[in-house]
Amino acid sequence: MKVIIADDSKVVVERLVDLLRDIEGVQVVGQAGNAVEAIDAIRQMNPDAVILDLQMPGGSGLDVLRAIRPEHPGLYILVCTNYPYPQYREECLSAGASHFLDKSAEFEKIPAIFDDLIRDAAKAIPGASQG
């Protein structure tokens, strides 16, 4: 599973890379520090999943979500933000986010989410789990 991380915080990006490194089948293929880079990276790399910050330079994660969702309907989009307000959650999920997490309280759920995604993908491909 190819993953792009779009977040303007280098510390957060490093933590996410560390969390995902130990998950078999997950490969971080790109990083973006602002909204424009995120849209370009998604269009160029065609990932399976994106971890998307809500507040970034050059536009919001919601702007990225609205720009890419029509082009990539099967893309798994995990919004991970320090702004977990209900109105943002509702707006992101309505715009097509697959999941919405509070960085400060739910960050450690990310490995389990990706474990589930890998497991579900293996079930969808006959014989994939047999190696």
What are these model-derived regions, one by one?
Residues 57, 85:
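The feature encodes the CheY-like receiver
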Residues 1-12, 16, 20:
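Conserved acidic segment of CheY-like receiver
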Residues 45-51:
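Active-site beta3 strand of CheY-like receiver
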Residues 25-33, 41:
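Short hydrophobic/Thr-rich beta-strand motif most characteristic of the beta2 strand and flanking loop
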Residues 87, 105-115:
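C-terminal output helix
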